[in-house]
Amino acid sequence: MKVYVCFPEGKAKALTMSYDDGKIQDERLVSIFNRYGIRGTFNLNYGMIDKEGLIPPRIKSSRINELYAGHEIATHTMTHPTIARCPMTEVAEEILADRKGLEQITGRIIRGHAYPNGSYNEEIKQLFRQLGIAYARVVEPAADFTLPTDPLEWHPTCHHDAPDLMEKAEFFAEFKKK
């Protein structure tokens, strides 16, 4: 038996974008995504929402549901620590509080994550499995379009400022299912 990986509506490829921290610049970014039918995952820190004095400012809780409608919300910890340096109890508290707060605001079940500062290890991945986190994005790019073998170590293809971004975009646009 053959198993074929496909995306919604049987599509052979998917473009996803992932941005962290819920910065005020998301207002403009989401409007561009919406204009072109691009969907993204926005990894938010519940502990920074509505906090005054942050530079750049963050999206207010009152704007989250409207702004990110049609996009995914994922965890990014409460306070953005470098979690591989933290005791596991603190990591669990950071994730659970972030998830609970985001679920309270959005009314959605939150299952994704992006590691703050790209910080993770095997012990953290095991903890995330126990906490119900289904996937987590790392910082280091994979430089290809393959799906991850470990969803808790999901490497992006590239970053938006990658020198070879346009080459990758052209390859992706020309890709045809065989």
Model-assigned labels for residue ranges:
Residues 1-31, 92, 96, 103-108, ...:
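C-terminal active-site subregion of NodB/CE4 polysaccharide deacetylases
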Residues 34-124, 141-154, 158, 178:
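Metal-dependent polysaccharide deacetylase catalytic core of the NodB/CE4 family, i.e.
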